[in-house]
Every structure is written in structure tokens, then in C-alpha cells.
Regions:
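Extracellular/periplasmic catalytic domains that process cell-envelope and extracellular macromolecules
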Residues: 38-40, 117-121, 201-204
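Zn2+-dependent metallopeptidase catalytic core
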Residues: 6-22, 26-47, 53-112
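Metzincin-family zinc-dependent endopeptidase catalytic domain
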Residues: 70-186, 190-194
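Metalloprotease/metallohydrolase-associated module, dominated by Zn2+-dependent proteases
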Residues: 150-170, 192-244
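Active-site-proximal beta-strand/loop segments in catalytic clefts of secreted hydrolases
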Residues: 51, 129-130, 212-213
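Structural recognition of the beta-strand scaffold that forms the well-ordered cores
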Residues: 45-48, 180-182, 208-211
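Short acidic, S/G/P-rich loop/turn micro-motifs used as interaction or catalytic elements
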Residues: 53-55, 132-136, 217
């Protein structure tokens, strides 16, 4: 009885929050995230709720502590602010009221991630590996349709990545790369050996984020732009500029 009562109260709070948010934002709150457009200044943001599952791998010396969990999530926020937020600026044209108001203006894009024990858009499994061993590695991945992510404890620090068997190498933060997938750009642009060179038209763009580098590209916003155009009929959103 108590649980159902508490759940009903929480649902009422959620409904009120949604009502207040809808007054300020144009929203597309789907299973992959809450995409918002600020009605006043045109700023675009993507809110992601992550439900973490912390796992100790065989080579980790100790299990996750609460301090380490909080530090990891704090570094997630730091990485997003340093490498994604306010680096991409969109704009809009078209015949809608919104497009008329913001035609040609810079519209900032940002990502916000909050951790939650309920209503998680994404289930995020983080494996603790041996951070002191340079050879300790676990392949990170996402399953888009299931909104499932696997990371490891080294994904918040830069590591050398090389393009196939060539000598082209760059430093990359794994989390930064995985966020590109999470916002809807599903292709990996790198290749693992010389035989794979033709698998993507962007395999030679080694400095790009979805390859082995850290630089953003306008093409990574395709899914976001498709959602924005559906949210505001009569509008044509596009990437205006990208800070590398």
C-alpha cells in the first residue's frame, strides 16, 4: 500500500514537472532522451537519464566504492562540458513561427546527463578494470535499440588509438566517442586493419571523433536534426558551425 501511494505521489510530481517544462520548451521526450528547444532563446539540449550498473572485472584490485562511482559520473559531466557542450551551433530556416524568430541565428547544442534509479533512458554498465595496467582493456559498446551501454573505468581518460595497421594514431577519450553513438550517430568510422579501409567513406578522417580522434563533425548531428525538424513543422534545422 505504501509503495503504491509513494509511486502515485511521484507520478503526480513528474506530471507537474512535465507541465512546467512544456511551458518553457518545445520537447520530444522519447525513449532515447528528452530533446528540448528553449522557446525564449532557441538553445537546444538533450537530457539523458543514465541508470548505472557498476561491475568489478576479474583484474580490478578492488570493487567500486561510492566515492569512485561519484567521481566517475563527475568526470562524465566534465568530459561532456569540455568536449561536446556549446561546441556545435545549429540554426534554422523555414516558415514556422520559430524559424521566423530564430532564422540564421546561432542555436547552441548541449548534452546533460543525470543518474537515476528509475526512468532510465539508458542502462549503463561500467566495468572496473585495472587502471594501473596499461594493457588492461575492455571494448566499450552500445546497443541503440535497447538503449544499453557498456563502458569501462578507463573510458574517461585519453588513450592512444591507431588506424588499422598504419602509424596514424591519435589520443581519444572513449566516453567522448560513445556519446556520438548515444545521440544517434551509429557508424564507427575507423577500420581495424588494411582490409577494412573501404567500410566507411570517412575512414581517412582520422582526427574525427567517430574515427580515432577528438574532433566533432556536423554529420554527427543527423539524428538530432531529424528529430528537431519533426518537433517544429515548417522548420529546417541545420548545423551552422562546429568548434573542433
Amino acid at each position: 500500500m505504501g509503495d503504491s501511494h509513494d509511486e502515485a505521489i511521484q507520478q503526480a510530481y513528474d506530471a507537474y514537472d512535465d507541465l512546467m517544462l512544456d511551458k518553457r520548451y518545445i520537447r520530444d521526450n522519447d525513449a532515447w532522451g528528452d530533446l528540448r528547444i528553449d522557446r525564449e532563446n532557441g538553445a537546444i539540449s538533450l537530457l539523458l537519464r543514465w541508470k548505472y550498473n557498476w561491475i568489478k572485472r576479474w583484474d580490478a584490485k578492488t570493487d567500486w566504492t561510492d566515492l569512485e562511482k561519484n567521481a566517475f559520473h563527475g568526470k562524465v559531466i566534465f568530459v561532456i562540458n569540455q568536449t561536446w557542450n556549446n561546441k556545435i551551433f545549429l540554426s534554422v530556416s523555414g516558415k514556422s513561427e520559430f524559424a521566423s524568430k530564430f532564422n540564421g541565428k546561432d542555436l547552441s547544442f548541449s548534452i546533460e546527463i543525470i543518474q537515476t534509479d528509475r526512468h532510465g533512458y539508458w542502462d549503463v554498465v561500467v566495468f572496473k578494470i585495472d587502471n594501473d595496467d596499461p594493457n588492461s582493456f575492455r571494448q566499450s559498446s552500445i546497443v541503440w535499440n535497447s538503449r544499453y551501454v557498456e563502458l569501462d573505468s578507463k573510458d574517461i581518460v585519453a588513450a592512444a588509438k591507431c588506424l588499422g595497421s598504419s602509424k596514424v594514431c591519435h589520443e581519444q577519450i572513449g566516453l567522448f566517442h560513445e556519446l556520438g553513438h548515444i545521440i544517434g550517430y551509429l557508424a564507427d568510422e575507423y577500420y581495424s586493419d588494411d582490409a577494412d579501409k573501404a567500410t566507411t567513406p570517412f575512414s581517412g578522417d582520422a582526427s574525427a571523433l567517430m574515427n580515432i580522434g577528438m574532433e566533432l563533425r556536423s554529420r554527427y548531428m543527423r539524428n538530432v536534426i531529424e528529430r528537431l525538424n519533426r518537433m517544429v513543422p515548417g522548420s529546417n534545422f541545420f548545423v551552422k558551425s562546429v568548434k573542433k
